[in-house]
């Protein structure tokens, strides 16, 4: 398949030089970007391509990467709000989740993937249960994902760990390489050191990364300190986890010493600002982490604690939160935010050649309308307008792995009406 995107008003490549191409084109050959340049250098004719997409009045970006979510938790959107994390989990979320059947997970994930496509996310990292159902939806829906079967030691134990490993081996590199897998011990407060060490051993043996929640609340920090005489991050080091690639969600309560350690280890952080605000958890020291060379991406967490999957909105909140926390208006500028949402996210999820619009890179591309919303006028700085005024609903076209999965706001891989019907059917059954 050969696709031409032509006459693009502005292309933000997100490369290391922060290159911008005005009135440009992108040629996609199979699943990779073959050529990217300004229109004056285009030597091909439209009939040389299987599909030609007009980029007039559009901005092109690399597809966005959601570094941490729980996709099927769309089923719990609006179910339990305005509660602290541990009470929220123990009294509302975990009891509800015990009632879910595999088919529920399938439809919850399908609603999430529909929402992600419609708001410009092309890759996401997911931790939940019944992940085989989520993998099926990813395969059908066309997105790229890193999937992990969440493990809580008291519920899962060795049997659950074996199931998680089986899932990882069955689905890793499936769907034309769009699916990767990780092992996922939920958190230090739900998994003992011995359990974490067992996960680390399997991670090493089968070359799998580790996805976990770390230092999300002050309560967790104090609990781990009292029980193990270390910080949650040091807990990972003591169990050997930091010898392996780790995707660490939250990292709010970390010390300077923790960050110095992280800078030397293969750990990436998923910053989830809206969930952290909504649950009253705290503010991750993102600018400090970035200054030390730690790779940080942006996640939404689940929709029950956010309550949407719009990464543009998430990025705006995340930028503003760092500015006010640091009392510094220059904290997390839009160029940094774009890097976090694209190439940083891709790297910490384990994808090479992703997150940059560059020849030879995977063709995950989104187009954003510049003339259909008041938010983009005047056109002084379209990237600034997107992150500080726009939303994911401004995305018009989504391409993943060289395949168009949304065109002119129409999702081509999922029946929207069927998804809405099934979700309402599940909700009625739960009431």
From Swiss-Prot:
Its cofactor is Zn(2+). Zn(2+) binds at residues 68, 70, 213, 301. Binds 1 zinc ion per subunit. It catalyses: S-adenosyl-L-homocysteine + H2O + H(+) = S-inosyl-L-homocysteine + NH4(+); S-methyl-5'-thioadenosine + H2O + H(+) = S-methyl-5'-thioinosine + NH4(+). Its EC number is 3.5.4.28, 3.5.4.31. Gene3D superfamilies: Metal-dependent hydrolases, Urease, subunit C, domain 1. The keyword Membrane does not apply. Disulfide bonds: none annotated. It holds the Pfam family Amidohydro_1. It comes from the Bacteria. This is 5-methylthioadenosine/S-adenosylhomocysteine deaminase. The lineage of its organism: Bacteria, Bacillati, Bacillota, Clostridia, Halanaerobiales. The gene is mtaD.
């Amino acid at each position: 398949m050969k696709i031409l995107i032509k006459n693009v008003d502005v292309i933000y490549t997100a490369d290391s030089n922060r290159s911008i191409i005005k009135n440009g084109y992108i040629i996609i050959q199979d699943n990779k970007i073959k050529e990217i340049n300004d229109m004056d250098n285009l030597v091909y004719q439209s009939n040389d391509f299987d599909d030609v997409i007009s980029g007039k009045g559009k901005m092109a970006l690399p597809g966005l990467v959601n570094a941490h979510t729980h996709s099927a938790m769309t089923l719990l959107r609006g179910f339990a709000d305005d509660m602290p994390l541990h009470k929220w989990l123990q009294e509302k979320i975990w009891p509800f989740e015990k009632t879910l059947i595999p088919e529920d997970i399938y439809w919850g994930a399908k609603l999430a993937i529909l929402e992600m496509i419609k708001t410009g996310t092309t890759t996401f990292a997911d931790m939940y249960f019944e992940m085989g159902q989520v993998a099926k939806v990813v395969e059908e829906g066309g997105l790229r994902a890193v999937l992990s079967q969440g493990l809580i030691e008291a519920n899962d134990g060795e049997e659950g760990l074996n199931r998680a490993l089986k899932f990882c081996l069955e689905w890793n590199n499936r769907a034309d390489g769009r699916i990767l897998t990780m092992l996922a011990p939920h958190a230090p407060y739900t998994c003992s050191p011995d359990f974490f060490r067992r996960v680390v051993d399997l991670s090493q043996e089968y070359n799998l990364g580790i996805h976990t929640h770390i230092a999300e609340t002050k309560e967790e920090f104090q609990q781990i300190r009292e029980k193990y005489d270390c910080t949650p991050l040091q807990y990972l080091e003591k169990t050997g986890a930091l010898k392996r690639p780790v995707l660490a969600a939250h990292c709010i309560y970390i010390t300077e010493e923790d960050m110095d350690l992280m800078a030397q280890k293969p750990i990436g952080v998923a910053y989830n600002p809206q969930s952290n605000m909504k649950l009253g958890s705290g503010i991750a020291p993102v600018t400090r982490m970035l200054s030390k060379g730690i790779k940080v991406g942006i996640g939404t967490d689940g929709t029950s604690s956010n309550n949407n999957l719009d990464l543009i909105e998430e990025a705006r909140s995340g930028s503003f939160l760092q500015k006010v926390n640091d009392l510094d208006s220059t904290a997390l500028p839009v160029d940094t935010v774009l890097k976090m949402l694209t190439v940083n996210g891709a790297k910490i999820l384990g994808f090479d050649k992703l997150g940059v619009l560059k020849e030879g890179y995977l063709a995950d591309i989104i187009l954003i309308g510049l003339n259909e919303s008041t938010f983009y006028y005047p056109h002084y700085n379209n990237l600034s307008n997107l992150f500080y005024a726009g939303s994911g609903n401004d995305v018009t076209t989504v391409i993943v792995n060289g395949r168009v999965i949304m065109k002119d706001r129409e999702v081509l891989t999922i029946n929207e009406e069927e998804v809405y019907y099934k979700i309402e059917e599940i909700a009625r059954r739960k009431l």
